[in-house]
């Protein structure tokens, strides 16, 4: 097997913005990792069920889902820590079933970091290289290179208990990378960090992955984390892949009510399709009247569908919009959540359903024009409505 990192690092597409990196759209592109109908069962529980997935060289891929959905099991199968009951896992076209974990060019960074408390930072990073019996001079050079890469120069002689949580996370990352794997697996790597540090570290991970050109696969239940770092996201539930797409596609074009509800905040309105045009779908809803959506759909007249609306795409005002009664509902403000950058209004419609509208706080310390118990109108553009058939 060749060096997957070098290939992707020299890819002119990869050297531009992350948006230009899209090998999954190229039918001739070859996957580095392929799950082919993989299943894994523990007792009577199907942890992973018939998963097929391609991950490409140089890709930052996120497995996202609630606890117990099978994402960590999928990671362990790739690492060789568990064995599939069905299906194959290929690395660069070769079935890796016969290859033991320590022979696979794959490293895994665990949520707990698993640092050796009796070893220094340098000792922890060098541990795997010493196990391989590399010359001392090479070990020293590679450890120094990794510590510089993760910005831990000058801390090599410290023990783990003398480091902050963020520094321990970097030591674990350096130890995972020092053996130069083709694929790095990250199991909830930022879960132990506070929110601010977690946000900063997400961008550091992205920059590091871009610089090295390696394939990263991260497991997380944090939607914001997955949306921030990943080129693509695989959303999992009950052992199955529900949708695989880029972060904007997952957010703006979810393939089901479940994905729409799991990724961020959403208003879901049930209705029945009245008409399907070339670019527009008309829905009749008992909750919200007549709705128009500029959303691609395979729905037919008479089908029951869900209409998903992100709160930030819903306008809130004291007066109805001049466009008329379509895509417009009236209600009363029941609650207001101030989130700093946003204010979220919970509005109880006349039929009892609650919808949310999110408004950016673009001015400072200005009294809200809309308050509790106000009578308001919610409206949205047709392109803001997503039609979901399942």
Regions found by a protein language model. Give the residues of each.
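The feature captures the beta-strand-to-loop junction immediately N-terminal to the Walker
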Residues: 64-66
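Helix-to-loop junction immediately C-terminal to a conserved catalytic motif
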Residues: 79
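Conserved coupling/switch loops of ABC nucleotide-binding domains, chiefly the family-specific signature
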Residues: 85-88, 138, 238, 270
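Non-catalytic connector elements of ABC transporters
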Residues: 2-12, 21, 266, 276-390
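ABC ATPase nucleotide-binding domains
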Residues: 60, 99-261
